[in-house]
């Protein structure tokens, strides 16, 4: 008989944590641990001091949350939080461990024990995808990333930039980026535009809090207070980090009905799981 691990269901509310109990094969949890240990984005963070577990996906304020955990654990302030903090690869520096760094039994405890506090953040999929485009495809990432430059060049090739009167060096338009994501998403889940249900695995991780990017200061403040962080420190841990210089546009200026439908179908599970409306692109300000 297969070993079973009891977990709870994730909720869309930022005060989640009391969902129905479900049973999950321990082998599936171990499969998740094996995947996490090879995750190049190092999305999971385990704070032993505060006994909390965080999974951070790109464009959901993950730099701010990771930096906060990094500092709360007593690690040195980094000269350049992005991208050093995410890669955990700076020589001579120490970092908060990832789940894959732990022995399997310890990691199972982090995922299943009521003694551990688990949280994550989500974002409206329309807004998150456009934010990823602005940060990595529309212009050079900061610092420049050869990886995302190659993706931009791949899109230009797929869409035949340089032909039919299109300049080869033209900025990749958002619609072409969306088409690229749709074509590659089944095989290539990038940390910054992956399906959130794929990256957060709510089927395996019982999150006590699922915070929202749209109410980040309030939700992360609640997380920090629950962890017992001193009240005078909290405002410094809520300051924006790694914000782009491009002014926010209403999503209705970016999407039309067809493009919104295309993105909705790509991220349908994210919309339903985390409580975002299909037509939310029309009401964004």
Segments and roles (model prediction):
Residues 1-285:
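Membrane-interface amphipathic segments in extracytoplasmic regions
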